[in-house]
Design a protein with these regions (language model features):
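C-terminal coupling/interaction segments
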Residues: 104-146
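Short loop immediately C-terminal to the Walker-B catalytic DE motif
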Residues: 22-23, 55
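Helix N-cap at the start of a conserved alpha-helix in ABC-type nucleotide-binding domains
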Residues: 27-29
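Catalytic Walker B motif of ABC-type/P-loop ATPase nucleotide-binding domains
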Residues: 16-20
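ABC transporter nucleotide-binding domain
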Residues: 34-118
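Conserved catalytic motifs of ABC-family nucleotide-binding domains
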Residues: 12
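Hydrophobic anchor residue at the start of the ABC signature
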Residues: 5
């Protein structure tokens, strides 16, 4: 894959379309490849369309996250909005029953507690101080949507 990307970059493209470009690479090589991608997009007229199952790569290099599941568009959002605002509320049934459902995206019941994906974790932390509110990763957000 490294050779293919080097060959593509040699043609001075404005757009790279990459499918699983970092899969199969060891963590050090993957990190170096992501640095190459970041350097490439520093030029204003350069973009990369990157398809990847490695969500940590997306968190490092993406500006926008588009999630497609079973051929259907699930969401397309600014990555910073997802990482900076979305959160997971962990709570019991008493707090769960009082949650403002307009702020929730999805939830999972786990034994005696709920995990709820919310659009605004700061608002949730303020409104429900007895709940545990934590940042949501891109992977967690995707898993809640399916």
């Amino acid at each position: 894959m490294k050779l293919a990307i080097a060959a593509a970059l040699a043609h001075h493209p404005e757009l790279l379309i990459l499918d699983e470009a970092t899969s199969g690479l060891d963590p050090i090589m993957r990190d170096e490849m992501l640095d190459v991608f970041l350097e490439f997009v520093q030029e204003e007229n350069h973009s990369i369309l990157l398809s990847s199952h490695i969500t940590s790569d997306l968190e490092k290099v993406a500006d926008y996250i588009t999630f497609i599941h079973k051929g259907k568009l699930v969401f397309s959002h600014d990555k910073d909005d997802l990482v900076d605002n979305y959160g997971i509320v962990s709570c019991g049934s008493v707090i769960f029953d009082t949650l403002d459902k307009t702020d929730t995206i999805a939830y999972r019941k786990e034994a005696d507690k709920y995990k709820v994906l919310v659009r605004n974790r700061n608002k949730a932390a303020k409104n429900y101080p007895k709940a545990i509110v934590s940042p949501a990763t891109i992977e967690e957000i995707m898993l809640f949507y399916v």
